[in-house]
Amino acid sequence: MVSGVSRNAARTSSGCIVALVSTDDDYTSQDVTTIPQAIRFPSSCLVTYSCVSCYLAIPSGKLHAASSFEHVLECTVAPVSEYVKSVFVGSSIECTGRSGSVTFALV
């Protein structure tokens, strides 16, 4: 997948910012701050999107596994970290962490 601009949040057409996490390892229910490839943005918003295979960063700071679904997520996450790369292209958001990438397609 294509990596984008480091330290830039991926914004939807409505201006919302999403939080994404790669699925290269099993991080289910662990705190976001303990996960090296957590993709985190300093804002909160309501975003509707479909996810093929990924983890979601939710308000509680926990991660929940997901595998092909559509979901409305209200996210409040930690400040963006220096190792995150993300890019918003057309109707999808591609993000790259230290050990993998994930693409979210906006619904």
Curated annotation (Swiss-Prot):
Its main location: other. GO terms for molecular function: 2 iron, 2 sulfur cluster binding; metal ion binding. Residues 1-8 form a propeptide. GO terms for cellular component: hydrogenosome. Keywords: 2Fe-2S, Electron transport, Hydrogenosome, Iron, Iron-sulfur, Metal-binding, Transport. It is found in: Hydrogenosome. Its cofactor is [2Fe-2S] cluster. Binds 1 [2Fe-2S] cluster. [2Fe-2S] cluster binds at C45, C51, C54. It comes from the Eukaryota. Ferredoxins are iron-sulfur proteins that transfer electrons in a wide variety of metabolic reactions. This is Ferredoxin.
